[in-house]
Amino acid sequence: FSQIRFPDNNQPWALNMARTIRRYREDYSWNPINVKYNDFSLQAGLLNGIKNVNPPIRLSFMPYASIYAESYDKQTTFPYNYGIDLKYGINESFTLDMTLIPDFGQVASDAMVLNLSPFEVKYEEKRQFFNEGTELFNKGRDMFYSRRLQDDLLNGSKITGRTKNGLGIAILNAITNETEENPLANYNIMILDQSLDNGSFISLMNTNKMQNGDSKNANVTGIFSRINNKENSHAYVAELKMSQEFDKDNYIKGYAGKLAVGKTSGNYQYDLYSIIEDDKYNSNDVGFLYSNNEITNGLVVRYQQFNENKRFINFSSSVAVVHQSLFTEQKFVDLEIEFENRATLKNYTTISLKADFNPYEKYDYYEAR
């Protein structure tokens, strides 16, 4: 209750609740959902009458101290840590979170992975500070990977919220201490996200890493938009990103972009998209990108039977065609055709069938040779 943002005046809240009965493959919701439309969040009900609520000041803090016993080469040391976490509700729209000299020693460790690929492993984020209130940053996809803020974190702070006019703002800043491998570094991530009618939005995001001394600095800027038509039957997506890497001797600039259009309602739906990354685009200083220098074009066509008929309770079928090539060299990489069918029978048994087909041999330019 003390952490919920209550406005001063009466404001309708969007709300929906759902229950899944697994044995019947059925979902029930408080507010009716038209399954012919993909965006369920736009079909929430309205909760009215929330007014005259006087919550306490949204302020909480948690100091902590920890000590460890470490034994190595017949020597035992007792390193210790201390710090504080703070959360403050600036107003009804925005919240400030801060952590000073955090200790993540109680966070579950990562599972061991035998990685034989040419790319690094992307691990799940388990630290609470980087999981709460960071949903807006996910719109940047490869631009932000919180596990980059890993080595000896000195402090972190973030401000998140959305104004009454639908402008979402999220700012995160963190400083990591100097280690034997890396210098002192400052990380900054910022996003502005304006909600539009019919679930549309336009966003501007920037990530920045500044390191002490002559080490490389990096900056990535991206603009993202999704426009839904009035009937929410079609969606149009556009993205443009620019990366910059610079030190005292070099300056590298790269670009990436995406265009997509899709039919998002009805029995027949489709997605048509094109993704381009040049050979100099690199978001890995703050984000996570497996590889650049790629062109990916794809088409997905789906048929979905929503109403029960004589044979099936529901049925879906899709075919996807994806073509990949290198951007700079204009060389073929792969052509994949994927078929997928899924049906729920009258006895509630669900059957699925999936098949992949590559008419040409795939050429992996990253494999060890």
Set out the residue ranges of the language-model regions.
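Membrane-embedded beta-strand positions in outer-membrane beta-barrel channels/transporters
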Residues: 60, 64, 83-84, 156-158, ...
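Beta-propeller domains
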Residues: 178-181, 185-187, 197-259, 278
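Residues that define the transmembrane beta-barrel architecture of outer-membrane proteins
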Residues: 57, 76-82, 151-155, 183-188, ...
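Transmembrane beta-barrel strands of outer-membrane/channel proteins
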Residues: 17-19, 63-67, 100-102, 171-173, ...
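Polar/charged side chains located within well-ordered beta-strands of beta-rich proteins
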Residues: 155, 171-173, 186-188, 194, ...
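Exposed, low-structure sequence patches enriched in small/polar residues
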Residues: 152, 160, 231, 235-369
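Structural preference for beta-rich elements and adjacent junctions enriched in aromatics
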Residues: 1-194, 200-204
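Flexible loop/turn segments at secondary-structure boundaries
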Residues: 22-24, 70-72, 94-97, 103-108, ...
